[in-house]
Amino acid sequence: MRLRMRKDSQQPTLARRACPARTKRKSSEVEECTGESKALLSSIKKFIHGSSIKVEQDNPAKTSHLSCELITSTPQRKNDLQRKSIYRARRRTSINGETTNHDTNKPNGKLEVTEEVVSSPPRTTLLGTIFSPVFNFFSPANKNASNSPDQVVEAEEIVKQLEMEQVEEMPTCTATSREPLSVPLYTSAMTSAFRPPPTAHTPEQESENTPHPDLPPLTAPGSPATGGYVDASITVPAEGSYEEEWEVFDPYFFIKHVPPLTEEQLTRKPALPLKTRSTPEFSLVLDLDETLVHCSLNELDDAALTFPVLFQDVIYQVYVRLRPFFREFLERMSQIYEIILFTASKKVYADKLLNILDPRKQLVRHRLFREHCVCVQGNYIKDLNILGRDLSKTIIIDNSPQAFAYQLSNGIPIESWFMDRNDSELLKLVPFLEKLVELNEDVRPHVRERFRLHDLLPPD
């Protein structure tokens, strides 16, 4: 009985033990089913929304990458914008000068090497831009002025671009020569007899002629030599002879080989209005710089007047010296001549100066500027045909005979003036100019016989 009872007692225990096992199996089966359903649901969610775990892992890395990009790229973009703006400024002013790129640090920390723009011409000074420019003489290798047509076209294109630009151009403040080189030429006091060119100067003689600090480096008012010539103080190089320099810088060599006017230039519309009944019959064309006045951007203690000029968003102060007997000459000549000022300088400067000197236009009736000149291989020549006046009754006075290369018989050369208070060249011309009006004839034979500029032209 006991054994049976034990067995009986053990049977329910086994039964009871078997039930949990069976229950566990059912629970595991339920858990497996629940896990499979959860896995299926999770897969559906992943398919629809994507993996949340991956998003949580990607977001920090992406945020870190963007933060690094924001910190390092901002100055780069700023530098890039600055560099682009500087390059635009350089392109705007590359024709008239070069600009300095102050942004020399690249984003990688290396120094940026400024590259020279090949197509840009060398820098020209402000004086050569708003004042009368220096003439480019023909070189011995290009005597016929036709050996390099590409250079000629390029020079003329550059000049046209200069004229098309507004006043906002290259700012620079260098005091250099504004007029062509002063070389031996006849003055108004010379006799009608032909004088030979001056003899060659030795380096010792040239070293004694030290120009004034205010004068342009290549031009200086010399003292009249024997025969009525004006001997310019030109530094002679260590090697080479004076004859070689004479061949390069002789203005009459320039005049001899200047190309003829084109059909377009010959048919230009006159820049002046028609004469009125009160207009004098004869016209007198006058140059400005070194003929009537001398202007400088350096402060002049003896300046007669000074005025500001706005040029390329920069204000420059111009100091002006008036040639002795400047006003007396104009007042006397304006009574018998139609006075026309014709300068190769920029209008922004010359027009403002004339507004100060002659505000009511009582002395100078008309004003012509650089845009009215003819550009020949980069040089500005004053073609008198643009006046629309009778050339038989027109005279031009200029300190550079190259300026009236196309009407040599109408031109009277005058010594360049800078600061000599004892100068009286303007007064010396008064009797001759008055006589031309009294004769009432073609002025060209008289001017030609008096100054004999054609005799200074080199032989064929």
Swiss-Prot record:
Keywords: Hydrolase, Protein phosphatase. CDD domains: HAD_FCP1-like (cd07521). It is an enzyme of class 3 (hydrolase). Its EC number is 3.1.3.-. The keyword Cytoplasm does not apply. Residues 1-31, 191-231 are annotated as: Disordered. InterPro entries: Dullard_phosphatase (IPR011948), FCP1_dom (IPR004274), HAD-like_sf (IPR036412), HAD_sf (IPR023214), TIM50 (IPR050365). Residues 277-436 form the FCP1 homology domain. Belongs to the CTDSPL2 family. Probable phosphatase. This is CTD small phosphatase-like protein 2-B. The gene is ctdspl2b.
